[in-house]
Amino acid sequence: MTAERTAGALALAITASVAALLSACNILQPAMYLAVGPTKVPARYVLENRPTVVFVDDRNNAIPINSSRARRAIADDVTKQLMSRRLVTQTISPRDAMALARNQDREGKLMSMQAIGETVGAEQLIYIEMLRYRGSPDNVTSQPTAECRLKVIDIVNKTRLFPPPGAERDWQAVVVQTAPVSPELYRSTAGRRQIEQLLVAAIAGQVTQLFYKHIPDELGSRLTPQ
């Protein structure tokens, strides 16, 4: 065999080997994904296991209709998820905290989160402030969207736990957008109530995800922390 033929045969053999290797990689990658699973996003903050209360505020009337109902639902849902995922072992009814604040507001007295936490017996308070809560991001697209910001307060030591002191921002921002919904839902009271429930679930779920390692959502609502 001539040197040229030998070199050609060697090149063909190398090419075949590389092709086989690449083919094997294409097979192995999905198999490895199934075996190991998708990469999880780490928690932004791990809550301390202390008596915790969730407070949802809407000082700027971001929720246009039934603000109190939506705020209670979000706070209740976050509280249930904290307990079900064992992120904390003791929570205080958010409705008690929000009712206390509402009663003080009626008397013209604005209570601080520190005072509310102390009064209801909490040692840790998750404060969520609603910034946007709409059935559509542009009044055209039928895709409910909401935005809020939050912080975790140490009631005992009177300091902010998350974001930590010295962080670039004092708040953790969360933007939530559900999957598109049928335009028909906007045309009835029952449909609009369903949209509200979708947003409540999306907000509560994405807020809670900040506190534990999780798989990023591929369908449904999406989280954009800033």
Task: Report residues per predicted region.
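Sec-dependent bacterial lipoprotein signal peptides
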Residues: 1-23
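A structural "domain/chain start" motif
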Residues: 25-96, 208-226
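Stable alpha-helical elements in mature extracytoplasmic
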Residues: 70, 74, 78, 109-113, ...
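Short secondary-structure boundary motifs at beta->alpha junctions and helix caps
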Residues: 154-213, 217-220
